[in-house]
Structure formats: structure tokens, C-alpha cells
């Protein structure tokens, strides 16, 4: 018997129709289970408040310029003020020949090869602009058995610079060396001064250099006085001396054989600064 609809009351399906609908739904669920399908989950309730939007991950467009070597360099670990090294007191018959790293690549290679062939290992304090001009210079220094350090980015007179500019000179060269070699270099040396100031020691330590390499003997080769004068200056070196010299000068190249012969005659061995202060 069919039930007639009553005005104002929702229509009700016949019991037989409900049973047929339930059976059909059960059959569909059974087929889904056999096929390994899961019935759709009930929708999750909306959160009470608006959810924060996630920031999209940065992406590099195909036309983006590559990062500069300075930007790619790993950061150094900040430390307290660096210690200034002027000369060693180990008593060993050793001296450190340390070179301002600048000049032309061809002449610099000749100087470094002459030192290596003469059995000398030296420390090259590189100027950052030199490394920028000759990106393979760092590898050349290391491949010849020498040591690399930081001699500021552009060799400005640091005592005339603001603290911020001094920091930039140190850190920019550090980052260039690290990008080329994987490390910041063995030492920092201030530019245009024999000794570091307290501020420069603090900045060097903050840049990750525990030691600043100053010197006790100036070879004067940067004034181009001639090989004889440079050799005469080197004859005043004693055990433990740190000697300041320069790449990029023809007179320095000409003086190398005699310098090494004089050191050998006095029983002094030229080593890297790291070896001297070990």
C-alpha cells in the first residue's frame, strides 16, 4: 500500500525502495573492497581560523646569473682577536720568505718556480684583486708546494680606512680564497704596514684568522733597488726571521738564486710560515 504525502511533511520513500538502495550501496562497497579501493574519506572539518600561507620555495630562473665566488664561499668561524706573529723563537735554523701576491702571472710563476726548484717553500699573501684577475694563481701557488694567505682585497692603506672598510678588505679576500681553494688561507697580513693594529687583530679574528702574519725584515724589493741590494737585505735575516718580499718584480726574480745560496751557506732553511711557527 502506497502512503500518500501529507502537506507540510517531507516525503518518505517506501520501505522497499530504501531496502533496494541499501543493497545497491552495499554491493558497490563490496566491489570497491575486492578491487583494493578505499571508500572516500569524509571531508575534514575546516580550521577555526585562517591558516597561514606557506612561502613558495625560491627558484632560480634559467636566465639568472650564477653566484659570485665570494657569495659561494663557506663562512669562517668568528674568533677572538688574532695573535700577531713577527718572528719565531723555536731555535730551529729556519726563516720564512713571505711574498706579497700580485703582479703578472708569467713573472710570478717564474719566481715561484725558481723558489721551488731551489728547495724553498714560501708563503704567498695574496691580494684579492690579483686572484680575481688570475683565478688559477691560487692553484699555481699550492701546486708548487707553497702556502697561501690573505693580504686584503685591494691592498689599500688600512690605517686610513674606516672599520667597516677594513672589515670588507679582509673578508672579501678571504671569501675569494675560500671559493678557489676551499679554505680562507693560512694567515692574514695587513696591507701597507709592518705591524697590525689592535683593531686589525680584532677584525682578523672575527673573520676567522687566529693569527696575523707580520714580519721583522723588509727586503725592500718593492722599491726595485736591484738584486744586489735585495740580497744584502736578506743577509741580515737570522733564525726565526719572517721576511717580506714581493712577486711581480724582475729584480726579485734575479735575486732568488743568490738569496737561496746565501741562506744555505749560513745553514738557514726557507720554510713556510706555518712550518716556522709550528
What are these regions, as identified by a protein language model?
Residues 15-16, 189:
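Short, cationic motifs built from Arg/Lys/His that form the positively charged side of catalytic pockets
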Residues 71-169, 176:
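Active-site beta->alpha N-cap acidic-glycine motif
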Residues 46-54, 58, 63, 69, ...:
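C-terminal domain-boundary segment and adjacent tail
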Residues 1-13, 25-31:
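N-terminal secretory signal peptides
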Residues 14, 91-92, 118, 144, ...:
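Residue-level preference for short coil/turn positions at secondary-structure junctions
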Residues 35-43:
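Bacterial lipoprotein signal-peptidase II cleavage site
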